[in-house]
Amino acid sequence: MFIFDSAKKIKREFIPQEQGKVSLYVCGPTVYDDAHLGHAKSALVFDLLCRVLNANGYEVTYARNITDIDDKIINRAQEQNKTIKEVTDFYTDAYHKEMALLGISRPDIEPKATESLDAMYALVQKLLDNKHAYTTDDGDVYFDTSSDSKYLTLSNRVQDESEKLQRVQSSSQKRNPADFALWKSIHDESVTFGSPFGKGRPGWHLECSAMIEKHLSKPNAKFAVDIHGGGADLLFPHHENEAAQTRCATDHALAAYWMHNGFVNIDGEKMSKSLGNSFFLKDALKIYDGEVLRFYLLSTHYRSNFNFNEEDLATAKKRLDKIYRLKKRLFGVTYEDEKTDFKKELLETLSDDLNISASLALIEEMITRANETLDTAGKHKELKREALSNLSFIEKILGFGIKNPYEYFQFGVNEETKTEIAKLIEKRAEAKKSKDFAASDMLRDKILAYGVNLMDTPQGSFWEKI
């Protein structure tokens, strides 16, 4: 398996520290608002990575944090006249539900910042003891970037004072403009945490380093984790600062491999709530099936920036429809999992830095061949079983085609209408059983009046939205 390492800027063969086992940490959401498509893209990329690692026989321990300490959360709580916990619980729950609709599995470990304060205090103390941090007269604790000879080697940035002043909070008590807060002393606000350094709140960069040390780091390991992932916008300063903290507080580096997914853009602009052009995931899910969004957001290589537009989304749906139409042709077929050339080739392609474009091309070719075979030898059970086995592998490794094919084509029909159609189908089945064909035809017309197609199969009658 090969992964493009963002730190080394090359594609490298993936070799975990412990044979057969992989530790993965991904920066999760700050839960002060609804998830947008950028959050979805990142979560999907690393969900796919876990699936591919598992398919290659690795046992994966996947951690993705929840940032529930942040100034934005405090501001939102004040705006809504709610407690911090009420705000973070609400948006965390919403995030989980929306990710589930995209077919994203929950991580093995999901640490919260509020549950990791002791680990943060320990990390800050180590940095102070190692002379990589200092305390100001105001009670703040800063990381001393000048003490770390490897600072900026992850992001490969050049010392640029103007850039650092733009991206890193300024303070007259900092020794260097690039120094960043490990602990922010706060005396005039109620949302503070007691610590050995006084009342205050942890720095954002500190949270992730501490949670990795607490949950994933192992004694005598060269790296705290095998793979560290996140959005490309986190490379600097967040991941740069994380790496510096871990390197200077412990006897190991933070990650053996770094993976970063590209931005999601709308009309060519980087998606960001601060720019006001964010497309909330919950709004997209009202219009499109979650699996369609999954297919669309994964349809370009994870490192490429993604330009979200409805024309491409409609095209993605048509490509996913092909999977379900083949699955529908095979409905009722039973099979045993078996090795096929297609599965081998698909896994090899995805194992090459998650090469999704080539993978989707393979899937299209397989669907075309399967349909041609079914057209000419439709009763050949072995061919049907092979096609269904291939579809099952696509479902497992990519999360495409997970639904009943008839239910997939019912998206957009409300539950009340679905219930009414189900009742009519049941009545029609009874009429056909009693050979009341006039009633059966009348009931069929009533069903079709809902704007659906009705299909009679050996397994029963099914319908789909036109």
Swiss-Prot record:
Instruction: Locate the residues binding ATP.
Output: K273
Q: What is its EC number?
A: 6.1.1.16
Annotated GO biological processes are:
cysteinyl-tRNA aminoacylation
- Which InterPro entries does this chain map to? Cys-tRNA-ligase (IPR015803), Cys-tRNA/MSH_ligase (IPR024909), Rossmann-like_a/b/a_fold (IPR014729), tRNA-synt_1_cat_dom (IPR032678), tRNAsynth_Ia_anticodon-bd (IPR009080)
Q: Where is this motif: 'HIGH' region?
A: 29-39
Q: Which SUPFAM superfamilies match?
A: Anticodon-binding domain of a subclass of class I aminoacyl-tRNA synthetases, Nucleotidylyl transferase
Oligomeric state and interaction partners are given as:
Monomer.
Known HAMAP family for this protein? Cys_tRNA_synth
Matching PANTHER family: CYSTEINE--TRNA LIGASE, CYTOPLASMIC, CYSTEINYL-TRNA SYNTHETASE
- Give the protein name, as stated in the record: Cysteine--tRNA ligase
What species does this protein belong to?
Sulfurimonas denitrificans (strain ATCC 33889 / DSM 1251)
Q: What is the lineage of its organism?
A: Bacteria, Pseudomonadati, Campylobacterota, Epsilonproteobacteria, Campylobacterales
- Gene behind the chain: cysS
